[in-house]
Every structure is written in structure tokens, then in C-alpha cells.
Amino acid sequence: MRIIFLRKEYLSLLPSMIASLFSANGVAAVTDSCQGYDVKASCQASRQSLSGITQDWSIADGQWLVFSDMTNNASGGAVFLQQGAEFSLLPENETGMTLFANNTVTGEYNNGGAIFAKENSTLNLTDVIFSGNVAGGYGGAIYSSGTNDTGAVDLRVTNAMFRNNIANDGKGGAIYTINNDVYLSDVIFDNNQAYTSTSYSDGDGGAIDVTDNNSDSKHPSGYTIVNNTAFTNNTAEGYGGAIYTNSVTAPYLIDISVDDSYSQNGGVLVDENNSAAGYGDGPSSAAGGFMYLGLSEVTFDIADGKTLVIGNTENDGAVDSIAGTGLITKTGSGDLVLNADNNDFTGEMQIENGEVTLGRSNSLMNVGDTHCQDDPQDCYGLTIGSIDQYQNQAELNVGSTQQTFVHALTGFQNGTLNIDAGGNVTVNQGSFAGIIEGAGQLTIAQNGSYVLAGAQSMALTGDIVVDDGAVLSLEGDAADLTALQDDPQSIVLNGGVLDLSDFSTWQSGTSYNDGLEVSGSSGTVIGSQDVVDLAGGDNLHIGGDGKDGVYVVVDASDGQVSLANNNSYLGTTQIASGTLMVSDNSQLGDTHYNRQVIFTDKQQESVMEITSDVDTRSDAAGHGRDIEMRADGEVAVDAGVDTQWGALMADSSGQHQDEGSTLTKTGAGTLELTASGTTQSAVRVEEGTLKGDVADILPYASSLWVGDGATFVTGADQDIQSIDAISSGTIDISDGTVLRLTGQDTSVALNASLFNGDGTLVNATDGVTLTGELNTNLETDSLTYLSNVTVNGNLTNTSGAVSLQNGVAGDTLTVNGDYTGGGTLLLDSELNGDDSVSDQLVMNGNTAGNTTVVVNSITGIGEPTSTGIKVVDFAADPTQFQNNAQFSLAGSGYVNMGAYDYTLVEDNNDWYLRSQEVTPPSPPDPDPTPDPDPTPDPDPTPDPEPTPAYQPVLNAKVGGYLNNLRAANQAFMMERRDHAGGDGQTLNLRVIGGDYHYTAAGQLAQHEDTSTVQLSGDLFSGRWGTDGEWMLGIVGGYSDNQGDSRSNMTGTRADNQNHGYAVGLTSSWFQHGNQKQGAWLDSWLQYAWFSNDVSEQEDGTDHYHSSGIIASLEAGYQWLPGRGVVIEPQAQVIYQGVQQDDFTAANRARVSQSQGDDIQTRLGLHSEWRTAVHVIPTLDLNYYHDPHSTEIEEDGSTISDDAVKQRGEIKVGVTGNISQRVSLRGSVAWQKGSDDFAQTAGFLSMTVKW
């Protein structure tokens, strides 16, 4: 059988031709082998393998060159090319044909079931059929790879058919080409398939896979031209049922065209029934049934009068779908019809010329999503028309479908959007300057924003619907207005905004139905120019039942807007710019609803001017009309006008736009607020009066500023966060009302003269400072600074604190009304003698309550006082005013400076700080019973009133200093038997624990716990004379002492602690060393150093050091009268040279030790009874004498401690021998002295002899 193609359009007959070719009379009969490359008679060719050479085949008219039934386990079932080989199959004239049928390569890594070409090899194929070829890997029919060189086309296929070819485990069911330039013209791809293994990495491109994987960004990507080519019934288990394309770096370019030569089917080329599974079980729109494009740019170039149809609306939407992230451009003046679900195409799409028709609803929703996600600020979706190609005409025709575009739909002036009856296009963003026509509907989606420019963009005979929160902006000029007046556009506001502010020719006084027919359930109209006159709602503002009506937005720039009376719109009135003139409440919409007036634009000046006595309170609404702050706004009330409004409200949209905004009250009239407010705006009263009619009209306002000549009247109880300190007007606190400062700015002082009236100023903010003269009552709920303030009213300080503390003493607070205490008074004061400067509270009215006083001692050294330091002055006439206030110092009731504690005492109605305890004089004896009528003597000279006896009150810390100094000098004292060598011992360990207490200076109860550990040992010893003996040793010790001092006057307590170390030498001499009797001498010398702490609650801790020499010389005579009894008189002189360092105490006092070194003497008698049982009882009697007092000097005041200058001691003990060389000694000692001095100490020592 002979088949001859007379014209290219006969390709549609190829399926039947192939069937006949394989019949008994067809190719099956072609058994002769080819005898060269010039085929004159049909023949069967063998497998061709070319390397770097050229092979051109020529097939005579009516003859067949057949490559069939070849099976190979390597790439290229019929033809293998490498190293730039060139392979051509061309008809000699027109009808010579080539057939590749049933060729197979096995193995998943072997490619090209019919032809394999690599390394820039070239294929040029004309009049060719590929049928039933199978590749184990890529390219069921053809595999071609190159390097994207700039030379000729790598793969050229013309007038061909690919049918039933399979890529078993790869890509490209018919053709796989990588890094190549490809030209396909007049080709049919039918029923080709790309499969994949379980790795799900292959199976792309059911018909063709064109890919570029060159990672060199400087190397150009390839391109593919697909002209007059049909794709039907192709499938991919992966992506791209008909076409898969992608690139690694620069986009791969594909041109899919239908040119002028295509005439079949009336010039309509149909691609259909292609599908991709995306590795799933069935067709997937995300996989791209027709095409999946990654980093590729695809151009659909359709010639004039031609149509390319992709998909069939009768099929599932996934079939013939387009998916991916690349760029699609429509060029050519012909038509492109998309009938599938293309919502998984998220790249950009441009219609530059011709028409694109969408045959399925919601089929391009997500165009532009990939780029918009990457760069939301530069977001594009679908573009219709072009600025560069302005001579072209581009159109998107949705017909009667329903289309939604998530991202921008942009139409240029040469773009057209056609929506037929029943159709709808929903947009979220973008603009359109071209033509929007048809009987369908354009919808601006909820919260969307869209711009229509020019009358041509409003040529729909259907509606433009603006949904809730959406904004439709119209732009135009005089010509556009004329066109719209001839054919008005219907706009339906369903909660949206119609913005006409950029429609430059909308004139004052015109009605919006001069070009627009506005209707809907609710919405906002933003007007243009000077006046928006709303006299009802005819065709303009229509409110549905149960819903808010259309809002009125005034956006008048520098102009004014006047509203007609009896407006019936149900929404709010919003002022974005300009001035809204108000003379009647009914101008602002239906008074049954009484919707608020809202200031909305932060960038523009917005004013509401009230020109007559407008009372916005409505009986039907039950409230006044509120003023809502979303931006700065000004309320101007003309002179003589008194107007009542509802509340000053926060931003009800939830955007908190009132924060940072300011309401300014201007004009000489009065603005009265009749409901509690919520705004956080600042409020400025520049002129006239702002008055409250109910409580808390501004409780959350960030600040209130009242300018010179302006007035704020409370009218009721008001909470105000903060008064602006630079205010210079008047704040009138009405009688019976309070103004409470809840969050006052404490960084600057507030001028008290701002306030007047018969009400009460209440400070509820810690740290507020008032200055000057306050002409109203004051209540302090929190800390309030009132240095040098005069209160011409009552001062109530029951729960807060009044402070005059500023680091400078001598300030006054004068109260010319009644003073009621209960809180705290904080003062600065010098703490010296009677002439110390101090802050004072001066009271000129009745007083009551108990006030706690806190004194900050800014300077002073502490001195005894007589009268004291006056801090509270009751200056009123006691015969006319009651003085029942009580004052007491905070905490312990005392304040310390230096060595003295000051307390607060009342004297003749005034209150003083005194550093003495006052001992009242003894009362006089009662008058005796007079004798009857004695002759009176001349009046005797009356005795003067007895002067009270004053005793200074010492601070308890003084006792702590004395304790530490005494402990430092006493801790390491020893007698002869207390160290090694003193009683024949070689090594001695001594542990001492003691406790003493006494009264210092007649008022400080001293207590001290002492503990000491000493270790001593002999270094050298020798003979002295006949039987005398001497010894020299060393000693070291550690002492830890803790105590306290309690004031018997104030009850205060100070704790003290010191711990230290000592090292030194010991020496002993015995007259009769062996007998241990007769005269002896003992001495020691030690250096001691201590770390000391003294602390008092609320007064900090003092840290200081002490160190010095202590030494002793002791003598005695040991007498043995017999029977083991020892009698030993002793005398000891002890040098005490431990001195404390000078230091500054926590109360800033300078503390030093006033007396120098001291000499202590001891006279004693030691006795013991040496028994035969190795236990020796002992008894010691001692008398101690200190010639000097222990003295501390604190800020020039000397405090002496004479309590322990003389004391006696009884000590009993026992010594036991553990072995011949080791013995233990223990004793207990009791001391008593003057001023209740008593000490108990225990001693334990272990001695070793060898």
C-alpha cells in the first residue's frame, strides 16, 4: 500500500493511514533491506549509530523508510547519535514518508525508544510517524540533549505524528529534550504516555518534556516553537499531561502558535483530553493536565482569525489544566480559549493582544500568587492590555462564567473585560483603565480595593457591586462625566465605599445619580470638591431593614460641607478633611439611630463647626450623638452657642486609631459631653468651654490641655489621666464634684493655680508635683509633692502621702482650710540642734486624724536639743479652731543622725523633733486647807516653773560600736596557764565561749556572745641559774563575737558582729622550774585584726576594720603550804592597743574611736588542790580595773562607757590527766561589775607535754 501526503493538513488522516500501513498489504510487506540513504523503493532500515558524522536520508515520493521492531538494551532503539552527529530524514519531494514503529530500549537508564541524540547532535525530520516506541527511561520516541548553543535548531520535526509512544520510567512520553532549541510544526501528539517508578521523580511530560538544567547563569536558556500542533489524549503520571517545561536559571522559552497557514476545522485547533496525575490516582489540576511550566515563559501566539482551544468544559476541570509558576503571555490577534481548571497556575499572565476566553468558572483565581507571596509590595496577577503595545487590542472574555481573581486584575487603556449576562468577575485589588462591558456584574470583594478610570471602565449594563469593607475608587474628567450622565453606571454598595474624591469634575450641588445609580444595603460615599448635599436618600443612600445605612464621608480638603436638614441616612457621618458645618442634629442622619460623627483621616485637617445650639440628644435613640476618634479632629463651637453631644469615643473599628490622635475644642462657645467616654486621644481646649454633664467624660484620654482663656468644667466627678503641665487656662472643679488624676505625668510640675472651684482635686498618681497656690480642696490618694504650696481649701491626706521632700530643707505647705490626716507626711530636715532648718506643715484651720511623718535627714551631725526642731505649726487661733491632729514618726518612731535618735513630740499644739527624752517635772504638792481668813502676806515672788530634765537619746548603733571595740581588745587575753609553756605544757589548745550583758550610758542594754579558739606551742626552753627555767613560744587564734544593743528609750535594736585573728609570742620564767614553785614571770605579745559589722533595721549596715597590739606582763608567787594545796597570788598588766578605723556610717555620720590605748590591771589569787587521782580542782579570784572609759566619737559627739571599769571575777575549774603527757582543763568564770555588768564564760583547753 502506498500513502502519499499531498498537503500538511492531511495529518488529521494519519491515524487511519497508520492502521492501514500495518495491515497485510502495508508495511508488513516491506521486507527488503535498505541499500543506502537514497531510498527509491520502500525498505526496512537497520539500527544506525553515528558519531560526529552527517547522514542524510532521502525518500522518494510514495515510498516508505521503515525503522521497526528493534529492541536494544542501550539507548537509541533505532538511531544512536553522539559527538555532534547530524541525522536527516527528508522526502525527496513531498510524499516520501518515514516510520518508526515498535522500537524498544530496555532498562530504566536507557533513553530514546526510537532515536537517541546527545552531545549537540542534530535531528531534522520531515514527514515522519513515531508509533508504539518504548523507552525504559526518557523519551519514548526521541531523546535529545545539547548545550543550548547559539547554532541551528537541535531538533526540527515537521509534518509528523507521535502516537502511542511510552517513556516507561522517565520523562517525555514522545519527546524528551534538554538544553536544546526545538522546532515542532504541523505535528500531532496523540495518546503518548510518561510513567514513573515509585521514586516519584519522573513521569513528567506525557507528550513532550522540554527542560533546561544548565546552571551557568550566563549561558542562554533554550527555546521551543510549537506551531500548528495538536495534543490529544496524552497522559503523565507526574506533571504536564501534554507539555512539561522548566529551567534551572534563566527561564526556558516556549512559543505555542497557530499561524495563518492553519485551515483545518475552520482555523480552530483543539487540544483536549490530556491529563496528569501528579503521582496520584487520577487527574490533578495541580499537576497540569495540559501543561506544567516551572521557570519557563510560554507565549500563546494566535494569528488573526485563528483559535486555539485547550480543554473541554464537559470534562473534569483537571483535564487539560495549566499549572505552575512561570509566565504566560498571550500575543497575536486570534483567540485563546481555556476550558479547564487553571487555579493551580500561580505565575503571572499577560494578555497583550487578541482575546482570552474563560469557559469554566473560577478557572484562573490564583494568577500571580507566587510572585505576590515573594514580594507583596510588587504584586501582579492578570494583566489585560499593555502600555508598550498600545496599538494592540487585548480582551478577557468571561462570558457568563463566574470568575474570582485573588490578586490584582489590571486593565490598561487598550484592554477590555467582557462580562455577559449571568457572568460575574470578583476582584480584590487592581485597576482598570480600559473597557468593561457586557450585561454581567463586576464585584469588588470584601475588604478589597479597586480603581476604575474613565467612563469606558463603567460601561457595564449590569451592576458594579462593592462588598463590605471594599473600596471602589472612580477617576475621571469632564468627558467621562458627560458619558456617564448619558448612560449612568449602576453601583451597589453592600457595606463598601465609593470614593469619588479623584473624580475631578464632580461639581458642588450635583446629585450622584448624575452619572451613577447608587443603591445597596449600606455603604459609604466619599464626595468631591466643596459640598456634598444629602437631602434624603433617593437613589443615593438606601438602608435595608435591620442594617446600618450608607455612611456619609466628608472629604472637602480646604473647603466646607453643608448638609440639609432631615437627612434619613442610617450610617455614621465621617469627616476625612475639610469642615462640616452643623446647625441641626437632623443633618447628620436619622435621629432614631443617632449614629456618631467620626474623624477618620490622620493626614488631613478635619473640622466640625457648630453654628447654633445643637442638642444631639434624641429621645428615640436614648443618647446624644457620639464623637468618635480615628484621627485628629477639631470641634469648633461658635460664640454664644451651647451644644450637647454624647460621648467622646474610641475607635470602634478595633484598629485603635484614637491612640495618638487629638481632639481640639475651639470657638468661644460651650461643648457639653453627656455620656462617659472611652477615647485614648489627647484633648485640647483652646477656646471656650468644655464641660461634663456626667461622670468620666475623659477617663482614658491621654492628656487634657486647657489654653489661656479657655475653661474645663467638671460638672460631675471626673477621672482624668493627666493634665498637660503647660496648660494656662482654668480647670473649674464644680461644687460637690471631684477631679481625680489617675495617670498624671510626673516628669514636670503642675501649676496648682490651674484649679479652682468648690469641688476637690484628688491626686491618685504617685509622684505628682504641684507648685503655687491651689484655690480648691485637695485630697491625696497617692504621693503628692507640695513644697511651698498654699492650699486655699481643705487638705485631706487620709490614704496617700504629702511630700515636701526635694533635697532642700525649709519648704512649707500652708493649708488655709481644714487638715485631715491619716496618710503620710514626708519632710526634709537638718538634724542638729534647736536651730536646725526643716520643712514645715502650717495649718490655719481645724485639724484631725493621725499622720505618719517620714523625715529625710538631708544634713546634720546629730546634737542634743532643748526645744526641738519645729516640723508642724498649728498657726490657727486655738480658741476658734480645733487642733485634734496627731503626728508620729514612721517605723520605730525615731529618726537617727549621728549618735542621736530624734523623736516627734507635741508642745503647745506644735510638733517638734527632739533628740532628748523629756522627763516631766514632779507635780506640785496639793494646796493645804487654808486657815480661815488669814491676813494675806504680800504676794511672794512666784517660783519659776521647773525646767524639764533632758537626757540625750542615743542611737542603738552606738552600743554596737562599743561591743565590737570591747570584744576586739578582750578576745585574745590570756593568763599564764592559758598558753603552752605557762604550766609546763608543750602544746596547748584553748577554746573559750562567753556571754556578757550590761547597760551602757544608762540607756543601752548591751549583750555580747564571744567565742575564741587559741593554739599555742613551745619553741625554745632552757635553764636559768641553778634550777630556774625559761620558755619561749608562739600563739595564734581566731575569735568570732556577736551581740546586740537595745535602746531602753526607743526600743530600737542594733546588731553587731566582729571576727578576727591574732598571732604572737609567749614567754615564761620560773624561779624553780622543776618544782614549779616560787616566783614566776609570764608575758605575751600579739597582733590582732578584726572585721566589724553593725546594723540597724531601716538604717543599713556599717562595715569597718580594727587592728592593733595587745600585750601582757604577769607575775606571781606559787606557794605550797602542804597536803597538795597550791596558793598563788598574781598581778597582771595588760596593754590594749586594738584601735578601730575611722569610717562613715550608713547614716552619713563619721565614727571614730576617741580614747587611745588603754592599760588594764588585774589582781588575783589562784588556788588548787593537787590530789593523787590525777584530778586537780582550781579556784581563782580576780579583780579587774580599767583606768579609762571606752569612748566612741560620732560626728563630734563623744559617748563614754564606764560600766566595766571595775569588776570582779570568780572562776572555778578542774584539770584532769588523760595520760602521762596529755591533760584537759575546764573552767567557768563569772564576772560582775557596775551598771548591771555580768559575764559568764567557759574555758576548755587541752595540753600536751613531751
UniProtKB/Swiss-Prot annotation:
Residues 919-948 are annotated as: 15 X 2 AA approximate tandem repeats of [DTPE]-P. SUPFAM superfamilies: Autotransporter, Pectin lyase-like. An approximately 170 kDa protein is detected in the outer membrane, while a C-terminal 55 kDa fragment is detected in whole cells. The full-length putative autotransporter may be cleaved to release the mature protein from the outer membrane; Pefabloc SC, a Ser-Thr protease inhibitor prevents the appearance of the 55 kDa C--terminal fragment. CDD domains: PL2_Passenger_AT (cd01344). The keyword Secreted applies. The keyword Protease applies. InterPro entries: AC_1, Autotransporte_beta, Autotransporte_beta_dom_sf, Autotransporter_pectin_lyase_C, Autotrns_rpt, Bact_Autotransporter_VF, OM_autotransptr_brl_dom, Pectin_lyase_fold/virulence. Keywords: Cell adhesion, Cell outer membrane, Hydrolase, Membrane, Periplasm, Protease, Repeat, Secreted, Serine protease, Signal. Residues 928-942 have a biased composition (Acidic residues). Residues 1-28 form the signal peptide. Residues 980-1250 form the Autotransporter domain. This is Probable autotransporter YfaL. It comes from Escherichia coli (strain K12). The lineage of its organism: Bacteria, Pseudomonadati, Pseudomonadota, Gammaproteobacteria, Enterobacterales. The gene is yfaL.
